[in-house]
Amino acid sequence: RLSFEVSDRYVLARSISDSQVAAAQVGRDSIVTRMNEVFADGGTVVCLPSTVSPAPLIGQKVSARHSLRLRNSALTSIAGNTGRPQISLPITELEGMPVGLSLLGDLGSDAMLIAMAQEISAAL
């Protein structure tokens, strides 16, 4: 059985038109172009928060979780949309909840990104 949120995404996906897919592809291509510019010099690693806020509380309203998921997608979809590796590290806590730092690497930088994550983790 799927949760409401997952079921809702399937229903939404079935309603997407070809023109909406084409428009989304234009947006995705724009993201890829921008990330190609960011990583053009080689050796770049982008550091960004893993999420926009600590994890939602158990029992939080669906509407609040939906809003959080939409805001988080701006951070969490970059790697998937561009084919780049991303790793998230638990860096600290805020009010007892983990706060993560994501490292986003260039195409093919997986091993370097893992090594960097290991160094950061060892230093904490």
Where is each model-derived feature located?
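Glycine-rich, N-terminal phosphate-binding loop of Rossmann-like dinucleotide-binding domains
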Residues: 50
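Short gly/ser/thr-rich secondary-structure transition/capping motifs
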Residues: 25-33, 68-69
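Structural helix-boundary/capping segments
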Residues: 81-124
